[in-house]
Amino acid sequence: MAGRSMQAARCPTDELSLTNCAVVNEKDFQSGQHVIVRTSPNHRYTFTLKTHPSVVPGSIAFSLPQRKWAGLSIGQEIEVSLYTFDKAKQCIGTMTIEIDFLQKKSIDSNPYDTDKMAAEFIQQFNNQAFSVGQQLVFSFNEKLFGLLVKDIEAMDPSILKGEPATGKRQKIEVGLVVGNSQVAFEKAENSSLNLIGKAKTKENRQSIINPDWNFEKMGIGGLDKEFSDIFRRAFASRVFPPEIVEQMGCKHVKGILLYGPPGCGKTLLARQIGKMLNAREPKVVNGPEILNKYVGESEANIRKLFADAEEEQRRLGANSGLHIIIFDEIDAICKQRGSMAGSTGVHDTVVNQLLSKIDGVEQLNNILVIGMTNRPDLIDEALLRPGRLEVKMEIGLPDEKGRLQILHIHTARMRGHQLLSADVDIKELAVETKNFSGAELEGLVRAAQSTAMNRHIKASTKVEVDMEKAESLQVTRGDFLASLENDIKPAFGTNQEDYASYIMNGIIKWGDPVTRVLDDGELLVQQTKNSDRTPLVSVLLEGPPHSGKTALAAKIAEESNFPFIKICSPDKMIGFSETAKCQAMKKIFDDAYKSQLSCVVVDDIERLLDYVPIGPRFSNLVLQALLVLLKKAPPQGRKLLIIGTTSRKDVLQEMEMLNAFSTTIHVPNIATGEQLLEALELLGNFKDKERTTIAQQVKGKKVWIGIKKLLMLIEMSLQMDPEYRVRKFLALLREEGASPLDFD
């Protein structure tokens, strides 16, 4: 049928605007007919018609969305012709529609069921024409929504014939809605409309993980397991589409607490988590910055941190982006409530404010709070419950594999520019740097670089760089080993100076008793290393004064090659109060728990306890603390060897401390003349003739002297003229009560 010229007009009523039909007079067309409207030779639009008597004959009325879509103006001359749908090819099978609130003032966060919306849509617009790109108004639950047709697929022809579906669907530009057409609603971009139900499209969500993110390039090494655990707990639920999370009834994790020794990568990990996520830039706050001298300002600072997340959640609901807030040194503001002195209670109210913001009455589901501390024991326990900082991750000292990764990261640029010598073996350095933290490994690389650079500085009155040699600058294995020896010592490692003074004269194996002590000590070391059933092994070396107990304990510790060795000695606690002693001992043991393998030597226990026989008197507070520490098993995966020494076994027996040790080893004095002669021969201070003279006096006789006292007597007698040395030595033995004999 040839087209006829008509004039565009305004839709006569609001009710007719909601029908999505063009309105004509019944003298021109009949209701239910479909027409093509041509505004130009290349622009044609399909409409379904309704009749209304108020429309002037020769006019065709359009709603505002229809006029916008077709680019029509009131009074415009257009060509209108009847159109007939081919129902075999143009019945709509599936139609995707973008939806949003029509007016800003009607925006709310109520959920809208897309299944009910789809049924209402089919009922309202059955047997109507729809085109891709068409705009219309849709009324549902007394709300007006703006719709935009995004995509149309024709119905499978087999279904129309009453046959099983073949799955063949063709995209079409214009189609007719029928009773079994399916409608899928898609939320408009940046819309806060909350759609639920199955009749909605899967949203094209931006991946929460930055596609350019790479673990090694980010400069994190040795934290693979920790990071995978954090990802599983905190981010796995955020990677899935919201509809799946909603169906599971799953709530996102809102908080992570990273704790561990200083320099192990807590701050670095938190910073890189922010970079890893496709979220807005994280807010990084140092704990003490929150505090303010004015009343209420500290709490206001907490509220400001969460303000953006609250505003966005109100506006976008479940589709709000992720807001990350990082608290460094969180223990500064989240101490146990009631633990602070003073009447202001500022710290308590700050904790209360933070608790209510993370998981209070008005819950935020678009935040991730990351707290960092090396004192998790100080933090209020309410902050650590599920729903708040529920993921607690220890960032401990890296193992050998982790140290290898960290050293690779810090030497990568040198390797790339051929500044790292071929003799540098990163694996060797990883083995040698036991108990080094990430920061200490970085410091080791810096120290080696400075050692290498120093070789190329001219030694003259001026500081000048030898540019000729600087061109061939190389950081060598020797630079790393020199830095390891002289510059960088691990905070949680073994300081050789601690125990070197105890064995500066070596171990004198004057007889089987000494060998037996060392052999038993080696067995206990192997038990600590290899046994999974006894992660805590403790041994008490007891014996008379000056028998060399401390030296043997230090030797066993040294031979163990454990990465962490500390000596808890009373000479480091002179003048300490009982409480200070307990805290010092606790710190040594706490540090030991952070290492995979640790050895703690508790020297001269009776002195630690302030024991004196007159009274008698001792410190019960220190005794109880020591008993607890001796029996406390290390954390999972850590192993601890404790070596104690005492000269008063009887006193420890009365205090019931002997039972706290796994085993007791007796360290005797030199008891026979033969043992004394063996010690003298090993020491080599006397000549053969002098030793023969001494042997005549002591051989086959009983003596009683500690090896430490023997060394003192030998050194004293050596100060005499050679002809009087032996006589002086024998006299000193008699005076010390080492022998009942009268020596000539």
Curated annotation (Swiss-Prot):
Entry note: cofactor: Binds 1 Mg(2+) ion per subunit.
EC number per UniProt: 3.6.4.6
Clinical disorder: Developmental and epileptic encephalopathy 96: A form of epileptic encephalopathy, a heterogeneous group of early-onset epilepsies characterized by refractory seizures, neurodevelopmental impairment, and poor prognosis. Development is normal prior to seizure onset, after which cognitive and motor delays become apparent. DEE96 is an autosomal dominant form characterized by onset of seizures in the first days or weeks of life. Affected infants also have hypotonia with respiratory insufficiency that may result in premature death.
The family this protein is said to belong to: Belongs to the AAA ATPase family.
The keyword Magnesium belongs to this UniProt entry's keyword annotation: yes
N6-acetyllysine: residues bearing it: 105
Native source organism of the sequence: Homo sapiens
Gene Ontology CC: cytosol; dendritic shaft; GABA-ergic synapse; Golgi apparatus; Golgi stack; lysosomal membrane; plasma membrane; postsynaptic specialization, intracellular component
Domain of life according to the entry: Eukaryota
Necessary cofactors: Mg(2+)
Gene (UniProt): NSF
Catalytic activity line of the entry: ATP + H2O = ADP + phosphate + H(+)
Subcellular compartments: Cytoplasm
Keyword Cell inner membrane in annotation: no
Name recorded for this polypeptide: Vesicle-fusing ATPase
